[in-house]
């Protein structure tokens, strides 16, 4: 994918905290639009000389994987961003939890956001998923309302 500014596989970091265990994100395009794909910065250097990333991704066989930073950025539309370190677990424990989930299947209810929260032992939530579902519900409700209004108007006209 990529963009004119960030070709596929570009590894560009925004300023921030990039120690091991930190949550990182990169904007990617999905069927529902652009989302922030999140992962955990690991303690190993890949052959690309960047830290590896543990993430739960549909693009990698619908499972939790540990990839090079270059692979993590392969579908990115922009730079890597540090999302911080939300929990109290030490980095070793976060990485141990993350690696214990390798090959765990991706599910809508266990996506990349749920995964990074779980690894940090904080409530596993997905604000992006909640936002998408809320939008879908509103659009659906509005569509149903318009349909119902159209049916009512149609009936009025047919009785005249």
PLM region spans:
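Short hydrophobic alpha-helical membrane-entry/anchor segments
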Residues: 132-136, 146-160
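Active-site nucleophilic cysteine motif
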Residues: 106-123
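Short helix-to-loop capping/linker segments positioned immediately adjacent to catalytic or ligand/cofactor-binding
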Residues: 28-30, 102-107, 149
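Aromatic/basic micro-patches that form nucleic-acid/chromatin recognition or nuclease catalytic surfaces
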Residues: 76-103
């Amino acid at each position: 994918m990529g963009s004119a500014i960030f070709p596929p596989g570009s590894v560009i970091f925004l300023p921030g905290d990039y120690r091991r265990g930190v949550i990182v994100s990169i904007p990617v395009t999905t069927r529902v639009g652009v989302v922030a794909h999140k992962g955990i910065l690991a303690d190993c250097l890949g052959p690309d000389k960047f830290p590896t990333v543990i993430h739960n991704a549909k693009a990698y066989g619908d499972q939790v994987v540990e990839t090079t930073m270059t692979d993590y950025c392969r579908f990115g539309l922009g730079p890597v961003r540090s999302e911080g370190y939300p929990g109290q677990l030490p980095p070793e424990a976060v990485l141990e939890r993350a690696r214990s989930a390798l090959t765990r299947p991706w599910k809508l209810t266990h996506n990349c956001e749920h995964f990074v929260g779980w690894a940090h032992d904080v409530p596993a939530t997905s604000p992006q998923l909640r936002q998408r579902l809320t939008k879908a519900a509103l659009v659906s409700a509005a569509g149903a309302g318009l349909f119902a209004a159209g049916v009512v108007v149609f009936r009025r006209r047919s009785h005249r």
